[in-house]
Amino acid sequence: MAAGGAVAAAPECRLLPYALHKWSSFSSTYLPENILVDKPNDQSSRWSSESNYPPQYLILKLERPAIVQNITFGKYEKTHVCNLKKFKVFGGMNEENMTELLSSGLKNDYNKETFTLKHKIDEQMFPCRFIKIVPLLSWGPSFNFSIWYVELSGIDDPDIVQPCLNWYSKYREQEAIRLCLKHFRQHNYTEAFESLQKKTKIALEHPMLTDMHDKLVLKGDFDACEELIEKAVNDGLFNQYISQQEYKPRWSQIIPKSTKGDGEDNRPGMRGGHQMVIDVQTETVYLFGGWDGTQDLADFWAYSVKENQWTCISRDTEKENGPSARSCHKMCIDIQRRQIYTLGRYLDSSVRNSKSLKSDFYRYDIDTNTWMLLSEDTAADGGPKLVFDHQMCMDSEKHMIYTFGGRILTCNGSVDDSRASEPQFSGLFAFNCQCQTWKLLREDSCNAGPEDIQSRIGHCMLFHSKNRCLYVFGGQRSKTYLNDFFSYDVDSDHVDIISDGTKKDSGMVPMTGFTQRATIDPELNEIHVLSGLSKDKEKREENVRNSFWIYDIVRNSWSCVYKNDQAAKENLSKSLQEEEPCPRFAHQLVYDELHKVHYLFGGNPGKSCSPKMRLDDFWSLKLCRPSKDYLLRHCKYLIRKHRFEEKAQMDPLSALKYLQNDLYITVDHSDPEETKEFQLLASALFKSGSDFTALGFSDVDHTYAQRTQLFDTLVNFFPDSMTPPKGNLVDLITL
């Protein structure tokens, strides 16, 4: 705080002047200095590398040391094959020793892009004098790299930079000393360790870990070490580690309670193309409609998670002033007002006429159990025409509904009739629930402008209630499978292309052409995608598999939680079917973000031998990370395993008893891998000391080296701020 209680003003971020210092190459007149001027309409105003063979780079030298916070890339006025699809930025006080500040890519458009560079270590700003830009991939395969214009911004006020420079020098010195301390302790150079620590007064780690090293490595007090780990777990010190672990999916088939003898009438039957929504407050799943293989359905169900029971709200909603039987419609729920909306449907070409092609729009009130027709024809009210395979999202806070895409049904011939006129797709609409008015936000567009969006069917669309954006990806347009991914800010009416789908990241993103069901967790900033079966018969039975993906919104990265790469066989193993749902399409997936559970029902298994077959299985899916209890048990297992191995060398009989009792209880005997590892431990009873492998610590005894290795393993579970440095001194030696 400044004098008088006023908050000190944030240091001013301004443009940082720089000069071109070094470069890998350049071609013809495309000189490195060209990046100093911004001329988006001049095609020659750029640096272009002579080749795309690595390493290609530009090194910029700032006029004086500065905290470099942002880098801005200017571009040519049109898309260009030489634009950087992937690049990295490094920075440092000298050109020989640089830290990675950014790894990213440019969109292939004409808009300037600004990126935030890493400029803090442990919340402390650090300065740079040199910035190195390393192109990795251009938008056109095998084209040279081009950079049109670069702007650096940050803080170069000496009054701010100098203290940061002093801190950075001190930080590097401190880390070097900590690496030495770690090395000395690993090799049991006690005098050197104590002398250096006494002289520098630098701590290698948190006192708790020093205590653990003393108890475990020096004294071999394994019981005290276990107590220390238990305290750490209970104090939440392993939480950071848990949050960084990958999810593991846990499917469970739900067998609902049966109230009637025959068990048929008290749960929804087989179907595909149905719709589900979930009320997370009451833990109730609502299911409406679908196609059972021969006809559309109009039944309406509620499943109570707490009661594990389905209730039939209505056998035929049309008889209760609700929607007629339908499939390929969409539903969304307003949890605040406890209302469900439904729009759209598929109609066979044989029953299409001007009356049946009207797009009706209904609202169901949960508390009063009543349906209300909001519109006989949304197109006449300024909304979408009759569509199917569209997407619909609810914004409860602003009481708005967004609907995007879907195929518009027309009278002229079948949807699959190639002689029919080109298929029409619906744009992006907003419905104001309060005023009951529609607004067209984006028409279907084939243009590639920054604010244009291409309509499609079978895509995923999700609303992030916290950052107030719609996320759209995947889908199909005529015969083309789309792989783009964009967000739409509902408040600013702005489209942001996350991925244009041209990246050849096969295996790193969910594959196109497969039915995808997606959910969102606004609290965790995650999008979940279950990828199932393709609707295309040709693509269907090559390699049927389910895969589950998670997109981290903040990190802008996909990760595959699992794939079951079983080949498609008519006789899928029974055991597999009991463990997880078989691949399918036309199913429904909903997510309870409060209790972190997914629910899946029904669908079409795509069996060519029985095309009318539909499913009525019901599953829950939990994404699990290691729990605190699991980590505590695992750490105890590691400690006791080591203790057993030490005992086995000294007193095999005592070791055997320890193995059968103390070590036995730390093993999960339902886990085949853990059980196998446990069974193999008995072989240690028959090993001689010479059988044990050296750990590279030739100057310390085997016991000390083994305990040090166990200590290093246990340290990995603690937060980085508490642990010794990750690197090793010997790794700095270059050959």
UniProtKB/Swiss-Prot annotation:
Q: Where are the Kelch repeats?
A: 284-330, 339-391, 400-458, 469-515, 526-578, 597-651
According to the UniProt record, what happens if one changes F184A?
Answer: Reduced head to tail dimerization
**Which Gene Ontology terms of cellular component type are present?**
cell cortex; cytoplasm; cytosol; GABA-ergic synapse; nucleoplasm; postsynaptic endosome membrane; postsynaptic specialization membrane of symmetric synapse; ruffle
InterPro entries, per the entry = Beta-prop_ATRN-MKLN-like, CTLH_C, CTLH_complex_component, Gal_Oxase/kelch_b-propeller, Galactose-bd-like_sf, Kelch-typ_b-propeller, LisH, Muskelin_N
Localization: Cytoplasm; Cell projection, Ruffle; Cytoplasm, Cell cortex; Synapse
Q: Which GO terms describe its biological process?
A: actin cytoskeleton organization; cell-matrix adhesion; neurotransmitter receptor transport postsynaptic membrane to endosome; regulation of cell shape; regulation of receptor internalization; vesicle-mediated transport in synapse
N-acetylalanine is found on A2
LisH domain location: 172-204
On subunit structure and binding partners, the annotation says:
Homodimer; may form higher oligomers. Identified in the CTLH complex that contains GID4, RANBP9 and/or RANBP10, MKLN1, MAEA, RMND5A (or alternatively its paralog RMND5B), GID8, ARMC8, WDR26 and YPEL5. Within this complex, MAEA, RMND5A (or alternatively its paralog RMND5B), GID8, WDR26, and RANBP9 and/or RANBP10 form the catalytic core, while GID4, MKLN1, ARMC8 and YPEL5 have ancillary roles. Interacts with RANBP9. Part of a complex consisting of RANBP9, MKLN1 and GID8. Interacts with GABRA1. Interacts with the C-terminal tail of PTGER3.
What name does UniProt use for this protein?
A: Muskelin
State the organism of origin: Rattus norvegicus (Rat)
Lineage of the species this protein comes from: Eukaryota, Metazoa, Chordata, Craniata, Vertebrata
Task: Give the gene name.
Answer: Mkln1
